[in-house]
């Protein structure tokens, strides 16, 4: 986060363009760096399946955070419909939303209904509608990683992030040569 914010605060040509299109682009760079933390500390794996495991990890992380993101969206929709809600009512709504989303998207896989696990994220109240940026950030990350192959990551980051706060697709066009798209079955 600090790398992105430092670059987009000090290296963007126009002050009004400082920043990124959304926090999904901040999260994307954080994900890029998180992947490199253990190798930087000397923990290197030569596992032939590492790339496949990484793809599975990204998929699973996205699947998990998408459920929480839906709880966030449903909860804020409920709050706008109930502006005088009390804290106990809000708590009930969050739990109800979490169970509804769990039952629709997770229970068929896990075989357990009415779980409230998706209600545990405090981000949804602390930082409204921030959570949906995580899955979008994984899509951006995937395309950035493809762009970084065979290149020096730091140089690419310094080339891409000073673009500033453009529309998401224009930013992606400059960064990777195309719009943000989800590619199934490979990068």
Residue map of PLM features:
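Catalytic Zn2+-binding segment of zinc metalloproteases
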Residues: 1-14
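Residue-level detector of alpha-helix boundaries and kinks
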Residues: 15-18, 56, 122, 129
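Short, glycine/acidic-rich hinge or "gate" loops at secondary-structure transitions
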Residues: 11-18, 43-50, 150-156
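C-terminal, non-catalytic "cap/extension" segments appended to globular domains
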Residues: 32, 61, 65, 69-187
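Histidine-centered active-site/metal-ligand motif
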Residues: 1-4, 27, 76, 123
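Post-HExxH zinc-binding segment in Zn-dependent metallohydrolases
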Residues: 18-58, 137, 165
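Short, surface-exposed loop/turn segments at secondary-structure junctions
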Residues: 14-20, 84-88
């Amino acid at each position: 986060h600090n790398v992105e914010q430092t670059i987009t605060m000090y290296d963007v040509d126009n002050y009004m363009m400082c920043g990124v299109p959304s926090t999904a682009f901040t999260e994307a760079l954080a994900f890029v760096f998180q992947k490199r933390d253990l190798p930087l500390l000397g923990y290197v794996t030569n596992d032939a399946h590492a790339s496949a495991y990484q793809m599975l990890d990204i998929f699973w992380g996205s699947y998990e955070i998408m459920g929480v993101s839906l709880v966030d969206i449903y909860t804020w929709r409920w709050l706008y419909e109930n502006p005088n809600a009390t804290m106990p009512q809000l708590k009930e709504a969050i739990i109800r939303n979490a169970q509804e989303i769990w039952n629709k998207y997770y229970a068929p896989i896990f075989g357990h209904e009415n779980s409230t696990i998706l209600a545990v994220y405090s981000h949804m109240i602390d930082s409204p509608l921030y959570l949906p940026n995580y899955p979008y950030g994984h899509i951006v990350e995937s395309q950035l990683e493809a762009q970084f192959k065979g290149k020096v990551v730091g140089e690419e980051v310094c080339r891409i992030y000073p673009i500033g706060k453009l529309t998401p697709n224009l930013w992606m066009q400059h960064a990777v040569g195309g719009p943000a798209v989800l590619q199934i079955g490979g990068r």
